[in-house]
Each structure stands twice: as structure tokens, then as C-alpha cells.
């Protein structure tokens, strides 16, 4: 048991975060299940699918991290994992836009319950995105430096907001990149050549919100780390 504890000790923070994310996901699904029992409707079934998609970038980020640490096939493996990660990453914060469904009250369930339900799913999805972005930023930071790491975060925030807009308003899916790449590229170039005011406002506001939220979360993480180190030094 002691040997197992020593092996797990270096990864206790990541294991704790993983356990919390799993717990948040389970609570989300339980809330959805309660709603289906109360209403007899599967109106918000898409939330379960969306939270599943939100886990994919986290898995890809862990894969990229594993290859980066082992330095094995890093030139090929990490870029491939990073590209796949970027394609699926918008699915994590995308759930925030599901809050728009609150504008259409559903009979049989109190509005406050639906508010908490969607917020719980959205919060969980956002945290999944934050953790996966933190892992990817760490890879970029170790390979290219701290400034490059933060430039990567800003670029991802902008691209993710673009992806969320495409998913919410144009109704495209991540897998369209694999099954309809040329068609989607042609359509995208058409939209990009004549951007609407709505698209400019949405992408600008969402990317600003996303980056600010990430930086705030990152700063709180540093504060907690400093406090933990301080407590450890005081106990010695």
C-alpha cells in the first residue's frame, strides 16, 4: 500500500482534478435523469451528448502530454494530437450557449431547475475545456517558452469562439472536417468573405470572456499552489 501511495503521490493533483470532473459529470447526468422523470420528456438529451463531446479534447490533451513527456515520435504524434484536440476543443465551452434554451420554458419542470441543470452542464464543460487547454499550454510552454504558451491560449480562445459560432449558428459539427472538408471549407470562405455583425460581436465577446475566465482560473491555481507551498514550509 505504501509503495502504491508513493507511485500515486506525484500525480495526486491530476487525479484529484480528474475525480472532480468525473463527479461533476455524474451530477449533471443525475440532474438530467431527475428532469426526465419529473417531466416524462427527454427535451435536454442533447446536454448529455454535449458533455460527452466535451470529454474528448481532455483525452486528446492527455495523449499529447504523454507523447510530449516521453519524447517519443514527438514531431509527428504531438502535432497530430494537437490538431485533433483543436478540432474537438470548441465542444467543451460550447455548452455555455445552451443557456439560450432557457428562453423557451418547458411545462412540468420549474424554471429554476432548468437553470441549475444547464448551468451545471455548462460549468462542467467549461472546466473540462480549461483543464485540457492547461495541458496543451504546458506542452507549448516547455517547447517554445512562456510567451508562446500564452499566445497559444489567446489563439485557441479566438479559434474556439469561431468554432462555437459555427456550431451554434451554422449548425456544423466537428466531424464535418473529416467527412465534408471541401464543402465546409468552401462554405466557410463564403461566410468569412462577408462576415455578419452578429458573428463579429459573438466571436469577439466570447473569446474575450473565455480568455479572461481562463486567466482568472490560472491565477487562482497559482495562488492555491503558493499557499500549499507556504503551508508545507511552515510544517517543516
Roles of regions detected by a PLM:
Residues 30-38, 98-100:
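Juxtamembrane "helix-exit" motif on the non-cytosolic side of transmembrane helices
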Residues 4-21:
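N-terminal membrane topogenic signal
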Amino acid at each position: 500500500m505504501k509503495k502504491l501511495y508513493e507511485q500515486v503521490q506525484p500525480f495526486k493533483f491530476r487525479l484529484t482534478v480528474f475525480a472532480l470532473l468525473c463527479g461533476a459529470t455524474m451530477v449533471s447526468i443525475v440532474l438530467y435523469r431527475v428532469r426526465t422523470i419529473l417531466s416524462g420528456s427527454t427535451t435536454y438529451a442533447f446536454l448529455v451528448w454535449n458533455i460527452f463531446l466535451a470529454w474528448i479534447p481532455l483525452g486528446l490533451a492527455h495523449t499529447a502530454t504523454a507523447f510530449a513527456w516521453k519524447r517519443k515520435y514527438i514531431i509527428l504524434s504531438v502535432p497530430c494530437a494537437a490538431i485533433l484536440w483543436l478540432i474537438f476543443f470548441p465542444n467543451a465551452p460550447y455548452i455555455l450557449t445552451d443557456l439560450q434554451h432557457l428562453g423557451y420554458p418547458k411545462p412540468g419542470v420549474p424554471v429554476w431547475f432548468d437553470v441549475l441543470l444547464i448551468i451545471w452542464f455548462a460549468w462542467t464543460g467549461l472546466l473540462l475545456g480549461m483543464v485540457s487547454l492547461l495541458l496543451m499550454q504546458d506542452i507549448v510552454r516547455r517547447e517554445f517558452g512562456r510567451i508562446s504558451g500564452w499566445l497559444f491560449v489567446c489563439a485557441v480562445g479566438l479559434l474556439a469562439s469561431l468554432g462555437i459560432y459555427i456550431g451554434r449558428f451554422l449548425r456544423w459539427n466537428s466531424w464535418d472536417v473529416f467527412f465534408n472538408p471541401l464543402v465546409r471549407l468552401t462554405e466557410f470562405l463564403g461566410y468569412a468573405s462577408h462576415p455578419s455583425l452578429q458573428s463579429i460581436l459573438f466571436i469577439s465577446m466570447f473569446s474575450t470572456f473565455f480568455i479572461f475566465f481562463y486567466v482568472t482560473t490560472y491565477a487562482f491555481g497559482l495562488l492555491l499552489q503558493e499557499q500549499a507551498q507556504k503551508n508545507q514550509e511552515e510544517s517543516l
